[in-house]
Protein backbone atom coordinates (compact mmCIF):
# COMPACT_ATOMS: atom_id res chain seq x y z
CA UNK A 1 0.00 0.00 0.00
CA UNK A 2 3.02 2.29 -0.01
CA UNK A 3 2.27 3.59 -3.49
CA UNK A 4 -1.38 4.21 -2.60
CA UNK A 5 -0.22 6.61 0.11
CA UNK A 6 1.33 8.73 -2.61
CA UNK A 7 -2.17 9.85 -3.58
CA UNK A 8 -1.92 12.44 -0.83
CA UNK A 9 1.76 12.60 -0.05
CA UNK A 10 3.17 13.09 -3.54
CA UNK A 11 0.69 12.89 -6.36
CA UNK A 12 -1.77 15.59 -5.26
CA UNK A 13 0.95 17.91 -3.98
CA UNK A 14 3.06 17.68 -7.15
CA UNK A 15 0.25 17.56 -9.70
CA UNK A 16 0.33 20.49 -12.13
CA UNK A 17 -3.46 20.88 -12.20
CA UNK A 18 -3.54 21.24 -8.42
CA UNK A 19 -0.63 23.68 -8.46
CA UNK A 20 -2.41 25.82 -11.06
CA UNK A 21 -5.64 25.77 -9.03
CA UNK A 22 -3.72 26.77 -5.90
CA UNK A 23 -2.25 29.76 -7.72
CA UNK A 24 -5.69 30.73 -9.03
CA UNK A 25 -7.00 30.63 -5.47
CA UNK A 26 -4.05 32.68 -4.23
CA UNK A 27 -4.73 35.24 -6.96
CA UNK A 28 -8.41 35.47 -6.00
CA UNK A 29 -7.53 36.00 -2.33
CA UNK A 30 -5.09 38.78 -3.21
CA UNK A 31 -7.75 40.42 -5.37
CA UNK A 32 -10.17 40.26 -2.46
CA UNK A 33 -7.64 41.94 -0.19
CA UNK A 34 -7.11 44.67 -2.75
CA UNK A 35 -10.83 45.50 -2.85
CA UNK A 36 -10.79 46.40 0.86
CA UNK A 37 -8.45 49.30 0.02
CA UNK A 38 -11.51 51.36 -0.96
CA UNK A 39 -12.34 51.71 2.75
CA UNK A 40 -8.96 53.27 3.53
CA UNK A 41 -7.86 56.87 2.87
CA UNK A 42 -6.12 57.42 -0.44
CA UNK A 43 -3.03 59.65 -0.09
CA UNK A 44 -1.62 61.42 -3.15
CA UNK A 45 1.47 63.64 -3.46
CA UNK A 46 1.98 65.85 -6.53
CA UNK A 47 4.87 68.13 -7.52
CA UNK A 48 4.81 70.13 -10.72
CA UNK A 49 6.21 73.14 -12.56
CA UNK A 50 3.11 74.98 -13.74
CA UNK A 51 2.30 77.87 -16.01
CA UNK A 52 -0.89 79.91 -15.72
CA UNK A 53 -2.33 82.65 -17.92
CA UNK A 54 -4.15 85.13 -15.65
CA UNK A 55 -6.15 87.93 -17.28
CA UNK A 56 -7.64 89.29 -14.05
CA UNK A 57 -8.15 93.12 -14.14
CA UNK A 58 -6.12 94.99 -11.53
CA UNK A 59 -7.55 97.48 -9.03
CA UNK A 60 -4.76 100.01 -9.73
CA UNK A 61 -5.29 102.98 -12.12
CA UNK A 62 -1.82 103.09 -13.62
CA UNK A 63 -1.99 102.17 -17.31
CA UNK A 64 0.79 99.59 -16.94
CA UNK A 65 -1.15 97.78 -14.19
CA UNK A 66 -4.47 97.18 -15.94
CA UNK A 67 -3.65 93.43 -15.95
CA UNK A 68 -2.35 91.85 -12.73
CA UNK A 69 -0.06 89.38 -14.45
CA UNK A 70 -0.03 88.32 -18.03
CA UNK A 71 1.46 84.94 -17.13
CA UNK A 72 2.48 83.03 -14.00
CA UNK A 73 5.03 80.29 -13.56
CA UNK A 74 6.18 78.42 -10.47
CA UNK A 75 6.42 75.20 -8.49
CA UNK A 76 3.25 73.69 -7.06
CA UNK A 77 3.39 70.95 -4.39
CA UNK A 78 0.42 69.30 -2.75
CA UNK A 79 -0.62 66.37 -0.60
CA UNK A 80 -4.21 65.17 -0.75
CA UNK A 81 -6.09 62.69 1.43
CA UNK A 82 -9.31 61.35 -0.08
CA UNK A 83 -11.76 59.22 1.88
CA UNK A 84 -14.89 57.54 0.61
CA UNK A 85 -17.71 58.38 3.03
CA UNK A 86 -20.69 56.69 1.38
CA UNK A 87 -21.01 55.09 -2.05
CA UNK A 88 -24.48 53.51 -1.95
CA UNK A 89 -23.06 50.00 -1.55
CA UNK A 90 -20.69 50.02 -4.52
CA UNK A 91 -17.66 48.97 -2.50
CA UNK A 92 -19.50 46.38 -0.41
CA UNK A 93 -20.91 44.74 -3.56
CA UNK A 94 -17.44 44.65 -5.15
CA UNK A 95 -15.99 43.09 -2.00
CA UNK A 96 -18.80 40.54 -1.81
CA UNK A 97 -18.19 39.65 -5.45
CA UNK A 98 -14.48 39.20 -4.74
CA UNK A 99 -15.36 36.99 -1.75
CA UNK A 100 -17.58 34.83 -3.94
CA UNK A 101 -14.88 34.66 -6.59
CA UNK A 102 -12.30 33.57 -4.01
CA UNK A 103 -14.71 30.96 -2.64
CA UNK A 104 -15.31 29.67 -6.15
CA UNK A 105 -11.55 29.47 -6.73
CA UNK A 106 -11.29 27.39 -3.57
CA UNK A 107 -14.01 25.05 -4.84
CA UNK A 108 -12.13 24.76 -8.12
CA UNK A 109 -9.04 23.79 -6.14
CA UNK A 110 -11.07 21.13 -4.34
CA UNK A 111 -12.42 19.91 -7.67
CA UNK A 112 -8.89 19.67 -9.06
CA UNK A 113 -7.86 17.57 -6.06
CA UNK A 114 -10.92 15.35 -6.48
CA UNK A 115 -10.14 14.89 -10.17
CA UNK A 116 -6.52 13.91 -9.60
CA UNK A 117 -7.47 11.48 -6.82
CA UNK A 118 -10.05 9.82 -9.05
CA UNK A 119 -7.58 9.88 -11.94
CA UNK A 120 -4.97 8.13 -9.81
CA UNK A 121 -7.33 5.47 -8.47
CA UNK A 122 -8.90 4.77 -11.86
CA UNK A 123 -5.49 4.48 -13.51
CA UNK A 124 -4.50 1.94 -10.85
CA UNK A 125 -7.68 -0.13 -11.12
CA UNK A 126 -7.93 -0.01 -14.91
CA UNK A 127 -4.34 -1.24 -15.10
CA UNK A 128 -5.30 -4.25 -13.00
CA UNK A 129 -8.34 -4.90 -15.20
CA UNK A 130 -6.27 -4.72 -18.38
CA UNK A 131 -3.68 -7.05 -16.84
CA UNK A 132 -6.35 -9.57 -15.81
CA UNK A 133 -7.90 -9.58 -19.28
CA UNK A 134 -4.55 -9.98 -21.03
CA UNK A 135 -3.44 -12.79 -18.73
CA UNK A 136 -6.72 -14.64 -19.35
CA UNK A 137 -6.34 -14.32 -23.12
CA UNK A 138 -2.75 -15.56 -22.88
CA UNK A 139 -3.89 -18.61 -20.90
CA UNK A 140 -6.55 -19.47 -23.45
CA UNK A 141 -4.11 -18.91 -26.31
CA UNK A 142 -1.56 -21.20 -24.62
CA UNK A 143 -4.21 -23.87 -24.03
CA UNK A 144 -5.34 -23.61 -27.63
CA UNK A 145 -1.76 -24.00 -28.84
CA UNK A 146 -1.24 -27.12 -26.71
CA UNK A 147 -4.60 -28.55 -27.77
CA UNK A 148 -3.82 -27.85 -31.43
CA UNK A 149 -0.48 -29.66 -31.15
CA UNK A 150 -2.18 -32.66 -29.54
CA UNK A 151 -4.86 -32.73 -32.24
CA UNK A 152 -2.31 -32.53 -35.04
CA UNK A 153 -0.51 -35.56 -33.59
CA UNK A 154 -3.81 -37.46 -33.39
CA UNK A 155 -4.62 -36.59 -37.00
CA UNK A 156 -1.20 -37.78 -38.10
CA UNK A 157 -1.84 -41.08 -36.33
CA UNK A 158 -5.26 -41.33 -37.87
CA UNK A 159 -6.96 -41.04 -34.48
CA UNK A 160 -8.48 -37.57 -34.98
CA UNK A 161 -10.47 -35.69 -37.58
CA UNK A 162 -9.21 -32.85 -39.75
CA UNK A 163 -12.37 -30.89 -38.91
CA UNK A 164 -11.57 -30.99 -35.20
CA UNK A 165 -8.04 -29.84 -35.96
CA UNK A 166 -9.33 -26.86 -37.94
CA UNK A 167 -11.80 -25.98 -35.20
CA UNK A 168 -9.02 -25.95 -32.64
CA UNK A 169 -6.79 -23.89 -34.92
CA UNK A 170 -9.65 -21.46 -35.47
CA UNK A 171 -9.91 -20.93 -31.72
CA UNK A 172 -6.14 -20.60 -31.44
CA UNK A 173 -5.99 -17.90 -34.11
CA UNK A 174 -8.93 -16.10 -32.52
CA UNK A 175 -7.30 -15.93 -29.10
CA UNK A 176 -3.96 -15.11 -30.67
CA UNK A 177 -5.63 -12.00 -32.08
CA UNK A 178 -7.39 -11.30 -28.78
CA UNK A 179 -4.07 -11.55 -26.95
CA UNK A 180 -2.50 -8.97 -29.26
CA UNK A 181 -5.49 -6.70 -28.81
CA UNK A 182 -5.45 -7.02 -25.02
CA UNK A 183 -1.68 -6.42 -25.10
CA UNK A 184 -2.36 -3.07 -26.74
CA UNK A 185 -4.96 -2.33 -24.07
CA UNK A 186 -2.48 -3.26 -21.35
CA UNK A 187 0.25 -1.10 -22.90
CA UNK A 188 -2.17 1.82 -22.99
CA UNK A 189 -3.12 1.23 -19.34
CA UNK A 190 0.56 1.07 -18.38
CA UNK A 191 1.26 4.32 -20.21
CA UNK A 192 -1.68 5.96 -18.48
CA UNK A 193 -0.55 4.67 -15.09
CA UNK A 194 3.00 5.88 -15.70
CA UNK A 195 1.78 9.31 -16.78
CA UNK A 196 -0.40 9.64 -13.68
CA UNK A 197 1.82 8.09 -11.01
CA UNK A 198 5.19 9.04 -12.55
CA UNK A 199 6.73 5.57 -12.21
CA UNK A 200 6.66 2.36 -14.24
CA UNK A 201 4.53 -0.41 -12.72
CA UNK A 202 6.37 -3.66 -12.13
CA UNK A 203 4.85 -7.01 -11.17
CA UNK A 204 1.33 -5.80 -11.91
CA UNK A 205 -0.26 -9.06 -10.83
CA UNK A 206 0.92 -8.55 -7.25
CA UNK A 207 0.10 -4.86 -6.99
CA UNK A 208 -2.25 -4.16 -4.06
CA UNK A 209 -5.74 -2.87 -4.77
CA UNK A 210 -6.93 0.35 -3.08
CA UNK A 211 -8.90 -0.41 0.06
CA UNK A 212 -12.66 -0.12 -0.28
CA UNK A 213 -12.95 2.74 2.24
CA UNK A 214 -10.11 4.82 0.83
CA UNK A 215 -12.56 7.65 0.06
CA UNK A 216 -14.66 7.14 3.17
CA UNK A 217 -17.72 5.09 4.06
CA UNK A 218 -20.11 4.19 1.29
CA UNK A 219 -22.89 6.78 0.89
CA UNK A 220 -26.58 5.94 1.16
CA UNK A 221 -29.16 5.83 -1.59
CA UNK A 222 -31.04 9.10 -1.91
CA UNK A 223 -28.20 11.20 -0.49
CA UNK A 224 -28.53 14.83 -1.58
CA UNK A 225 -26.02 16.03 -4.15
CA UNK A 226 -25.85 19.56 -2.72
CA UNK A 227 -22.19 19.05 -1.75
CA UNK A 228 -21.17 18.14 -5.29
CA UNK A 229 -18.19 20.37 -6.03
CA UNK A 230 -19.25 21.24 -9.57
CA UNK A 231 -22.67 22.21 -8.21
CA UNK A 232 -21.07 24.42 -5.56
CA UNK A 233 -19.04 26.15 -8.27
CA UNK A 234 -22.25 26.81 -10.21
CA UNK A 235 -23.84 28.15 -7.02
CA UNK A 236 -21.01 30.66 -6.66
CA UNK A 237 -21.64 31.80 -10.25
CA UNK A 238 -25.09 32.83 -9.04
CA UNK A 239 -23.62 34.73 -6.09
CA UNK A 240 -21.06 36.49 -8.30
CA UNK A 241 -23.76 37.56 -10.76
CA UNK A 242 -25.98 38.78 -7.90
CA UNK A 243 -23.17 40.89 -6.42
CA UNK A 244 -22.44 42.38 -9.84
CA UNK A 245 -26.11 43.34 -10.23
CA UNK A 246 -26.00 45.04 -6.83
CA UNK A 247 -23.09 47.12 -8.07
CA UNK A 248 -24.99 48.08 -11.23
CA UNK A 249 -27.98 49.13 -9.12
CA UNK A 250 -25.73 51.29 -6.94
CA UNK A 251 -24.38 53.12 -9.98
CA UNK A 252 -27.71 54.97 -10.22
CA UNK A 253 -27.22 56.46 -6.76
CA UNK A 254 -25.01 59.34 -5.57
CA UNK A 255 -21.79 58.95 -3.63
CA UNK A 256 -20.14 61.12 -1.00
CA UNK A 257 -16.38 61.61 -0.72
CA UNK A 258 -14.27 63.71 1.62
CA UNK A 259 -10.97 65.35 0.73
CA UNK A 260 -8.28 67.12 2.74
CA UNK A 261 -5.46 68.87 0.89
CA UNK A 262 -2.38 70.95 1.65
CA UNK A 263 -0.85 72.93 -1.24
CA UNK A 264 2.27 75.07 -1.57
CA UNK A 265 2.65 77.49 -4.51
CA UNK A 266 6.08 79.02 -5.10
CA UNK A 267 7.20 81.94 -7.26
CA UNK A 268 4.72 83.80 -9.39
CA UNK A 269 2.03 81.23 -8.61
CA UNK A 270 1.88 82.70 -5.11
CA UNK A 271 0.43 85.95 -6.60
CA UNK A 272 1.46 89.64 -6.67
CA UNK A 273 4.65 91.29 -8.08
CA UNK A 274 8.29 90.34 -7.64
CA UNK A 275 7.41 87.03 -6.03
CA UNK A 276 10.38 84.89 -7.01
CA UNK A 277 10.95 83.88 -3.40
CA UNK A 278 7.33 84.08 -2.27
CA UNK A 279 5.22 81.12 -1.25
CA UNK A 280 1.50 80.64 -0.91
CA UNK A 281 0.01 77.91 1.30
CA UNK A 282 -3.52 76.55 0.90
CA UNK A 283 -5.51 74.21 3.13
CA UNK A 284 -8.74 72.69 1.84
CA UNK A 285 -11.37 70.43 3.37
CA UNK A 286 -14.09 69.34 0.94
CA UNK A 287 -17.09 67.05 1.13
CA UNK A 288 -18.38 66.24 -2.34
CA UNK A 289 -21.62 64.63 -3.42
CA UNK A 290 -21.33 63.14 -6.91
CA UNK A 291 -24.38 61.96 -8.81
CA UNK A 292 -24.29 61.12 -12.48
CA UNK A 293 -27.73 62.08 -13.75
CA UNK A 294 -27.29 61.00 -17.36
CA UNK A 295 -24.61 58.95 -19.06
CA UNK A 296 -26.09 58.00 -22.40
CA UNK A 297 -28.08 55.05 -20.92
CA UNK A 298 -24.84 53.10 -20.40
CA UNK A 299 -25.63 52.21 -16.79
CA UNK A 300 -29.13 51.08 -17.75
CA UNK A 301 -27.76 48.74 -20.41
CA UNK A 302 -25.13 47.39 -18.02
CA UNK A 303 -27.81 46.79 -15.41
CA UNK A 304 -29.92 44.87 -17.94
CA UNK A 305 -26.84 42.88 -18.95
CA UNK A 306 -26.03 41.97 -15.34
CA UNK A 307 -29.65 40.98 -14.70
CA UNK A 308 -29.53 38.67 -17.73
CA UNK A 309 -26.26 37.17 -16.45
CA UNK A 310 -27.90 36.47 -13.09
CA UNK A 311 -30.83 34.71 -14.74
CA UNK A 312 -28.40 32.72 -16.89
CA UNK A 313 -26.44 31.68 -13.79
CA UNK A 314 -29.67 30.49 -12.15
CA UNK A 315 -30.52 28.42 -15.22
CA UNK A 316 -27.04 26.90 -15.37
CA UNK A 317 -27.23 26.02 -11.69
CA UNK A 318 -30.60 24.31 -12.15
CA UNK A 319 -29.23 22.38 -15.12
CA UNK A 320 -26.11 21.27 -13.23
CA UNK A 321 -28.25 20.22 -10.26
CA UNK A 322 -30.58 18.09 -12.40
CA UNK A 323 -27.67 16.58 -14.31
CA UNK A 324 -25.74 15.77 -11.13
CA UNK A 325 -28.81 14.24 -9.50
CA UNK A 326 -29.37 12.11 -12.59
CA UNK A 327 -25.72 11.03 -12.64
CA UNK A 328 -25.86 10.02 -8.98
CA UNK A 329 -29.03 7.96 -9.47
CA UNK A 330 -27.50 6.23 -12.49
CA UNK A 331 -24.24 5.64 -10.62
CA UNK A 332 -26.14 4.20 -7.66
CA UNK A 333 -28.15 1.87 -9.91
CA UNK A 334 -24.93 0.80 -11.60
CA UNK A 335 -23.30 0.11 -8.23
CA UNK A 336 -26.26 -1.98 -7.06
CA UNK A 337 -26.37 -3.88 -10.36
CA UNK A 338 -22.65 -4.67 -10.31
CA UNK A 339 -22.89 -5.77 -6.68
CA UNK A 340 -25.79 -8.11 -7.41
CA UNK A 341 -24.08 -9.46 -10.51
CA UNK A 342 -21.06 -10.51 -8.45
CA UNK A 343 -22.98 -13.41 -6.93
CA UNK A 344 -24.05 -14.55 -10.38
CA UNK A 345 -20.50 -14.35 -11.70
CA UNK A 346 -19.14 -16.18 -8.67
CA UNK A 347 -21.63 -19.00 -9.19
CA UNK A 348 -20.76 -19.08 -12.90
CA UNK A 349 -17.10 -19.64 -12.02
CA UNK A 350 -18.06 -22.55 -9.76
CA UNK A 351 -20.32 -24.09 -12.43
CA UNK A 352 -17.73 -23.75 -15.18
CA UNK A 353 -15.04 -25.27 -12.99
CA UNK A 354 -17.24 -28.25 -12.13
CA UNK A 355 -18.25 -28.72 -15.77
CA UNK A 356 -14.61 -28.55 -16.82
CA UNK A 357 -13.66 -31.24 -14.33
CA UNK A 358 -16.51 -33.49 -15.51
CA UNK A 359 -15.69 -32.91 -19.18
CA UNK A 360 -12.02 -33.63 -18.53
CA UNK A 361 -12.97 -36.89 -16.83
CA UNK A 362 -15.19 -37.82 -19.79
CA UNK A 363 -12.34 -37.02 -22.17
CA UNK A 364 -9.94 -39.23 -20.25
CA UNK A 365 -12.56 -41.98 -20.38
CA UNK A 366 -12.85 -41.50 -24.14
CA UNK A 367 -16.40 -40.15 -24.05
CA UNK A 368 -15.77 -36.47 -24.94
CA UNK A 369 -13.71 -34.84 -27.71
CA UNK A 370 -10.75 -32.63 -26.82
CA UNK A 371 -12.62 -29.66 -28.30
CA UNK A 372 -15.15 -29.94 -25.47
CA UNK A 373 -12.39 -29.92 -22.87
CA UNK A 374 -10.83 -26.84 -24.45
CA UNK A 375 -14.20 -25.10 -24.61
CA UNK A 376 -15.00 -25.72 -20.94
CA UNK A 377 -11.51 -24.69 -19.83
CA UNK A 378 -11.85 -21.48 -21.84
CA UNK A 379 -15.27 -20.79 -20.31
CA UNK A 380 -13.80 -21.33 -16.84
CA UNK A 381 -10.87 -18.97 -17.46
CA UNK A 382 -13.03 -16.22 -18.94
CA UNK A 383 -15.60 -16.47 -16.12
CA UNK A 384 -12.77 -16.10 -13.61
CA UNK A 385 -11.48 -12.93 -15.21
CA UNK A 386 -15.03 -11.60 -15.54
CA UNK A 387 -15.50 -12.11 -11.80
CA UNK A 388 -12.18 -10.44 -10.95
CA UNK A 389 -12.87 -7.45 -13.16
CA UNK A 390 -16.42 -7.13 -11.84
CA UNK A 391 -14.98 -6.79 -8.34
CA UNK A 392 -12.81 -3.95 -9.64
CA UNK A 393 -15.82 -2.42 -11.41
CA UNK A 394 -17.64 -2.44 -8.08
CA UNK A 395 -14.84 -0.40 -6.52
CA UNK A 396 -14.85 2.05 -9.43
CA UNK A 397 -18.63 2.41 -9.17
CA UNK A 398 -18.36 3.03 -5.44
CA UNK A 399 -15.69 5.70 -5.86
CA UNK A 400 -17.83 7.38 -8.52
CA UNK A 401 -20.59 7.79 -5.92
CA UNK A 402 -18.15 9.66 -3.69
CA UNK A 403 -17.11 11.87 -6.60
CA UNK A 404 -20.69 12.85 -7.44
CA UNK A 405 -21.43 13.66 -3.81
CA UNK A 406 -18.29 15.74 -3.35
CA UNK A 407 -16.98 13.28 -0.76
CA UNK A 408 -13.56 12.45 -2.17
CA UNK A 409 -11.69 12.44 1.13
CA UNK A 410 -8.90 9.85 1.24
CA UNK A 411 -8.62 8.50 4.79
CA UNK A 412 -4.90 7.81 4.43
CA UNK A 413 -2.62 10.32 6.10
Briefly describe each language-model feature range.
Residues 20-35, 112, 116-135, 146, ...:
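Amphipathic alpha-helical coiled-coil segments
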Residues 1-48, 54, 161, 194-244, ...:
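Bacterial Sec-pathway N-terminal export signals of envelope proteins
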Residues 1-2, 115-227, 237, 331-334, ...:
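Periplasmic alpha-helical coiled-coil/stalk elements that build and connect Gram-negative outer-membrane
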Residues 22, 96-99, 162-173, 304, ...:
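Short, charged, amphipathic alpha-helical segments
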Residues 50, 54-57, 62-63, 177-184, ...:
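Outer-membrane beta-barrel domain signature
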Residues 42-111, 235-244, 251-320:
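Small/polar-residue-enriched beta-strand and adjacent coil segments characteristic
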Residues 190-202, 252, 316, 396-411:
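Long amphipathic alpha-helical coiled-coil segments
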Amino acid sequence: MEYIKNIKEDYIVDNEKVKAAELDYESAVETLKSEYSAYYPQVTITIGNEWEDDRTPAKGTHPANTITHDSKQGIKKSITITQMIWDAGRTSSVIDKAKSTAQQAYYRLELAKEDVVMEAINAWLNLQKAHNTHEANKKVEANAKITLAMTIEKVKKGEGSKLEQLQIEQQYRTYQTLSMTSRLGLDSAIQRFQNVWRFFPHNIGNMPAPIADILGLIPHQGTEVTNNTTLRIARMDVEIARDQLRFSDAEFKPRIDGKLSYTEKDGELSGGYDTDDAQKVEFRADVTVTWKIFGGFKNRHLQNSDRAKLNAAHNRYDDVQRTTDEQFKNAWNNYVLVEKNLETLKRTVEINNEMYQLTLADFKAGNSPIMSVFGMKTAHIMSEVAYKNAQIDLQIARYQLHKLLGLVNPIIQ
